[in-house]
Amino acid sequence: MNKLYIGNLGENVSPLDLESLFKDSKIPFSGQFLVKTGYAFVDCPDESWAMKAIEALSGKVELHGKLIEVEHSVPKRQRSRKLQIRNIPPHLQWEVLDSLLAQYGTVENCEQVNTDTETAVVNVTYGNKDQARQAIEKLNGFQLENYSLKVAYIPDEMAAQQPPQQHPQGRRGFGQRGPPRQGSPSATTRQKPQSDVPLRMLVPTQFVGAIIGKEGATIRNITKQTQSKIDIHRKENAGAAEKPITIHSTPEGCSTACKIIMEIMQKEAQDTKFTEEIPLKILAHNNFVGRLIGKEGRNLKKIEQDTDTKITISPLQDLTLYNPERTITVKGSIETCAKAEEEIMKKIRESYENDIAAMNLQAHLIPGLNLNALGLFPPSSSGIPPPAVSVASAAAAASYPPFGQQPESETVHLFIPALAVGAIIGKQGQHIKQLSRFAGASIKIAPAEGPDAKLRMVIITGPPEAQFKAQGRIYGKLKEENFFGPKEEVKLEAHIKVPSYAAGRVIGKGGKTVNELQNLTSAEVVVPRDQTPDENDQVVVKITGHFYACQLAQRKIQEILAQVRRQQQQQKTLQSGQPQPRRK
């Protein structure tokens, strides 16, 4: 995305005029300006400079009396589902942006772009071309908190590789049918082993030159020796004391590269008489940190004891919407820090793979579920590859309502700390309203059972995808607002009601089904004994666990109930069509 389109040019604008403009603005360019009547094209050295040119010039600079427009140059065949939205208010809440984007269709992905400007920039992928076109028509120039949004297409490489579909197929949110083409980005992503989670490090800025080496010789040697791809993000956070490094390789390759980098920094510190301790700093997405720490900090303590290191983790308060990573600081010798890195990353990779498995299973249980748009999983900008979520299998689709029918609504009672009610509701009820719109669910908070009640019940009503979105955001909000400590994982209790005649099927013979359910989902599932069915002949099933565990358990129980309903329907059909002989 380093090729630029320059529009709204006067008839007399020459390549020299544009060269002077770019030089005056200190924006480098490569090659010649290709000038046409009213517009021109030029290449920047990289995507970062292209973004700076857009921010500095578009709608801000006049040439021969006309205000010029600068955008990414996008071939017509690649103007499909991907948009870039600029000039977003810097303190805008994520839920507000979410709900605004969702008005025009299914948002498959939304990632922030690093820029030097005060305002935010995001790249958005919509579910289809029409949704993106509608969004660009409605949002370009849209006033949001006194900021005028700027929206333009960015290249959609997938659109260029796929032939146009003659007939629309499937429901909104479904991807292409059949496997992706060989060589396509999605094919590559699907084949990528899930263990290939990159290692993200923070290194002092003064050592970056030594790590790169003269004309890049040192970094090339490391990549060759470890069979890895190493990105040093020098341009991020200009003037910062530390720079992130992303290492893509096998777990062994990442660890070897990490150790070599630590050795280079130590040697450079000795040569420059730098006396301060240089700890190993690892960046990890907040989603994984709770499991790394473990219950009461046991996992972290064990790593410290086994590796003879001191490990600290940055506080939750340091997190922002666009920076969901925590800094894990490891102090010790190079050898002990290297051992600690292996153990820390092993735990993070396990958590990542478990979440991938849970999310993929969710996609099979809820066909068309758009996981990337939920904001519940690390974006690729954090250095962790996004999960490859395929469309549902035929077997899963068979249990889903036929096209044209709405999925059945469910009611879940989720119990949250009583002190968290204000955060969930928000000022004048704004947060709960935004959450309800975003998820497409009815969300109500039941009155407290008493003045000293420690828990409050949130009643969520909506189809499976709405449940997933609403509950996921509630879990996230509780963690974000520090209602659970930095060493705690958010675990909540959810209640769902099932017909009393189906409770036995949930439990299974000798408790077999409920035990299998707990093993599969890692959630605690309890069907209290001796329950008196309510006026609708229903009993409560209690589910306790972290978000993915709780969701999987809910889906599996709903699957059991759907199976029971189908069997009942079949029996009714048989009885009405072919009367069964009575037993004597």
From Swiss-Prot:
Origin superkingdom: Eukaryota
Assembly and interaction partners: Homodimer and multimer.
Polar residues bias spans: 184-194
Keyword annotations from UniProtKB, A to Z: Cytoplasm, mRNA transport, Nucleus, Repeat, RNA-binding, Translation regulation, Transport
Name of this protein: Insulin-like growth factor 2 mRNA-binding protein 3
Gene Ontology CC terms: cytoplasm; cytoplasmic stress granule; cytosol; nucleus; P-body
Main location: cytoplasm
GO annotation, biological process: CRD-mediated mRNA stabilization; mRNA transport; nervous system development; regulation of translation
Family listed: Belongs to the RRM IMP/VICKZ family.
Sequence ranges assigned to domain RRM in this UniProt record: 2-75, 81-156
UniProt region (Disordered), positions on chain: 160-199
Record's subcellular location: Cytoplasm; Nucleus; Cytoplasm, P-body; Cytoplasm, Stress granule
Domain KH: 196-261, 277-344, 409-474, 491-557
Organism: Gallus gallus
Entry note about domains: All KH domains contribute binding to target mRNA. Domains KH3 and KH4 are the major RNA-binding modules, although KH1 and KH2 also contribute. They are also required for RNA-dependent homo- and heterooligomerization. The integrity of KH domains seems not to be required for localization to stress granules.
Gene that specifies this protein: IGF2BP3
Lineage of the organism: Eukaryota, Metazoa, Chordata, Craniata, Vertebrata
Annotated function: RNA-binding factor that may recruit target transcripts to cytoplasmic protein-RNA complexes (mRNPs). This transcript 'caging' into mRNPs allows mRNA transport and transient storage. It also modulates the rate and location at which target transcripts encounter the translational apparatus and shields them from endonuclease attacks or microRNA-mediated degradation. Preferentially binds to N6-methyladenosine (m6A)-containing mRNAs and increases their stability.
Pfam families xrefs: KH_1 (PF00013), RRM_1 (PF00076)
Any GO MF annotation of the entry: N6-methyladenosine-containing RNA reader activity
